[in-house]
Amino acid sequence: MNRILLLEDDVSLIDGLVYSLKKNEFDVEVARTVCEAKQYLSELDRYDLLILDVTLPDGTGFDVCERVRKENQQIPIIFLTASDEEVSIIRGLDSGGDDYITKPFKLGELCSRIRALLRRAVYAKREKNTSMECGDITIDLLGS
């Protein structure tokens, strides 16, 4: 089961979104502030995908995204926010986001976008693994 970290401060949205994502077989953990998200992200490898709101009480999802990208270029990041201004969309994508979805949104579309990003992430991991190791022996799978 894929694990998602959701950074969102709107409690009513959190409840419905967590319920729906779990029904779609995603494991979801929630952070309500940037500070709380930083604690979760100290173990970034636990997550397969991040969903970030932009406007939070103690910072922005853009800042979280930029911090994550310094450590991990591969993890898919989706911005899910009410801010539909072009400047916000551009900043989200330029800061390292893979997708930008505005509220209100369709849950089916969000789940499809999540699955698409997770498929690409798995493929990218496979591409990255070009050698095998067993003890002292390393095999170059590409023969280069």
Model-derived features: positions:
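N-terminal/domain-start alpha-helical segments
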Residues: 1-123
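Short, Lys/Arg-enriched segments at the junction into DNA-binding effector domains
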Residues: 116-144
